[in-house]
């Protein structure tokens, strides 16, 4: 089975992935269950979502099927998420003439390198191509964290990869002649002859190991692939077979076929060019027949097992047409790989079960054969003992003679060894009695072994039986040939001679007569027959137990949870909310959060729709796209949802909801026209409320079936774009929340830093000052020097008489600004200058005159000697940072204000999302009819009256059971209901429905339940008790 993509496959896949993925954002990265080398990359952008499967070193492709994901990611995936999550894929390119794919994120800030040669690797690089993380460490290449990755450079993305295009174009224009092919083969022949000469010289010199060396000649397939490596190995092999050339044949044998080889290469090159340039993409899958397939038992999809995939039509020999088939897949080549691997993974479980069943059947057959062998052994023992008993009776006189002869020697008190030597001597002399005895004698147990020939009576009996059978055969088949008759007579004569020569050893007890010895054998036969009956009886029970045990093991393995690949279905827009479809076909929605409530109102609610609420501040919406009167049953069902989703469920309060038309609802405050908080609405006219009777808190859980309808496959949901816009808005809101949290953290850090600095300055001041008087003097001296410094920078106009007050103020401001620009002036003094303090200007003039001759160097030296220069620099740096942070906060504030204005526009716009509600009604069915093609199963949590037409439903009421336990019990109940194998009775469950229910997991259904603490009521069973076991009876009264 093909597991690794070839160089041609990667070239085609890279082009498709570049076209499909560039511009998408990587939303998340996951491990795929049962493999640490497989990864799932999820990309999205406002109008679509794409999933990419990466198997390290083996394959990469877009998939339309879901993959099982482990609960916790690996360390490598955590590293990838940290750097690549939410980054945009800006470029995707393949390294020239190499099986390396490079994904560029965030305009070159990060690179994800996928290697598909050898064992493969996945490497994360930073903007300088420095390795940040590796999927596996390869010592041969010395790729380590912190080193520069050298398999590509910046030119791969900066030069638009012109070199790669040039090499591809060069390969595309290549032409091959018979002279060129002849040169290749001649070069191989010359190397072969030189190697032969070297080996002969080694043989002449008598060096060891020379005879063991063999000169290998490359096959024609290997030679062509080494000369034209850009052509795929599979493509060359296919075309060699088309030209009736064995790919494994030696290239030296085709020295006279250079013309056909050149034609083969040119046709292969032409096919290669067509694969790269064609826009009509197709893929092909070669499947082979499953040897374990049983048509009466297995499903049709197990008849053939996928073996290989190619971008070209594979070649099948004429004799393999029955055992192989070619499946053509229309569309991009990614779709071919997705179908190939997804089908293999989906059928892997079924094939495993099929293999386990065959192994179980083999175990049963082996056990049955072992039991048959035991019974046959008992039958053989009975037959042998019966024959021995009859032989002893027939040869009773002979047996007595042998007994008397041996007994006479024993009576003479001869040594047992001497007796055996005497018998051996008599056997050589031809003594008839001695020849019947088997040595050694078992005199210790007073027994001897005697060899008896089959009696003439038994021979006559067997011959009579043969004659009778021959006579019967002749009567029944009078047309038989005379030659067959003669051959059967010859066979019977040979068998009689063989039987006459056959001897049987019989054990004789010297203490018993011949007939008594025969009785012993008949007793053994009787005991064996009784044992046979017991064995046969026990065998029947044992076989039944073995079959039951194996059947239980198979059922247990079938019940074990296994991951089933499901095609990713685009969810309906209302599936992200709490929803149900009423018994009259009206869509009822409720947001799971205040933000979702606002989304429903702004995106989908129109004036003729219904708004429903209650005293617990729950909000439910009823869509009325046809603008008809909403039936009372729908209002009642929506009221049940409204009350059940509130605190009334946990408190078990039966209250009355109320409703009004959506045109009576506003999102703006009536006084200042500002937007109300999330999830809050205002009624324009309080008198338009319509109260309903108290709602019963009875919900239910059931299944809807999405079936294929006309145009179902071609037309997607009309609201996908709206959904993506909502997701973008949610992402923006999350970003704003994160920014606000970051601002709070920064402010807290600044306050802590400021406090620490103030504390450290106070401590330093106490340490340096010595006492309070000295510190006061130093501070006053420092202050005077700074004032003198400032005076130097101040420029006072000499024409004081002509200056007006405004001019003076202006001059003061300009001078102050110039002082502020100097790096060495404290900001606190500058701010004090601007304050109108009496006598300040005169003091500044004196300072300016006093330090008029002081240059910049002397001033800085004085400040450094005083120790105030560093403090001034820190203060200025802090001021700059505060200004920058203030600007960032202003930008964020403006962004949030802009978002609020957009939100206000969202609530005021009249255009709503366009949704085909009739299409949804036709696709979703509460029960299946014969002939329906099911796309998917959709679980629903809805009021019980809305589920009365559903085939699969259970009642849920307030209780104390947990959600997961309740869902487990519900799914177990649905799976254990009886089935209608023919799928004709609409009232009974169908196998197809149970197969889809088995794919559901409790964890995926928990979010559907908008209530907590449940009590489930299942038909024909006792309802789940509140809080587990009932309380024990109270103690007896004293």
Curated annotation (Swiss-Prot):
Where do Acidic residues bias regions lie?
Answer: 714-761
Which GO cellular component terms, listed alphabetically, does the Swiss-Prot or TrEMBL entry include? Answer: cytoplasm; cytoplasmic stress granule; cytosolic ribosome; RQC complex
Q: Does the keyword Protein biosynthesis apply?
A: yes
Query: What protein name does the entry list?
Result: Ribosome quality control complex subunit 2
* Major localization class: cytoplasm
Q: Where is the composition biased (Polar residues)?
A: 795-805
Q: What does the UniProt record report as the effect of altering residue 9 to A in this chain?
A: Reduced ability to mediate CAT tailing without affecting binding to 60S ribosome subunits
Q: Which UniProt keywords apply?
A: Coiled coil, Cytoplasm, Phosphoprotein, Protein biosynthesis
The record gives the effect of mutating residue 98 to Y as: No effect on protein abundance. Loss of CAT tail synthesis. Loss of ribosome-associated ubiquitin-dependent protein catabolic process
Please list where the region (Disordered) is annotated.
459-499, 708-824, 877-898
Give start-end of the signal peptide: none
Q: Which family does it belong to?
A: Belongs to the NEMF family.
The UniProt entry's coiled-coil ranges are: 350-383, 713-768, 830-912
Source organism's superkingdom?
Eukaryota
Something else the entry says is: Present with 7700 molecules/cell in log phase SD medium.
Report the residues modified as Phosphoserine. 797
| Species, as recorded | Saccharomyces cerevisiae (strain ATCC 204508 / S288c) (Baker's yeast)
Where does it live in the cell?
Cytoplasm
Q: GO MF annotations for this entry?
A: alpha-aminoacyl-tRNA binding; mRNA binding; ribosomal large subunit binding; tRNA binding
Q: Which residue windows does the record flag with biased composition (Basic and acidic residues)?
A: 780-794, 877-894
Gene Ontology BP annotations: CAT tailing; peptide biosynthetic process; rescue of stalled ribosome; ribosome-associated ubiquitin-dependent protein catabolic process
Q: Which InterPro entries match?
A: NFACT-C (IPR021846), NFACT_RNA-bd (IPR008532), RQC_Subunit_NEMF (IPR051608)
Task: Explain the purpose of this protein.
Answer: Key component of the ribosome quality control complex (RQC), a ribosome-associated complex that mediates the extraction of incompletely synthesized nascent chains from stalled ribosomes as well as their ubiquitin-mediated proteasomal degradation. Thereby, frees 60S subunit ribosomes from the stalled translation complex and prevents the accumulation of nascent polypeptide chains that are potentially toxic for the cell.
Assembly notes: Component of the ribosome quality control complex (RQC), composed of the E3 ubiquitin ligase RKR1/LTN1, RQC1 and RQC2, as well as CDC48 and its ubiquitin-binding cofactors associated with the 60S ribosomal subunit. RQC2 binds to the 40S-binding surface of tRNAs.
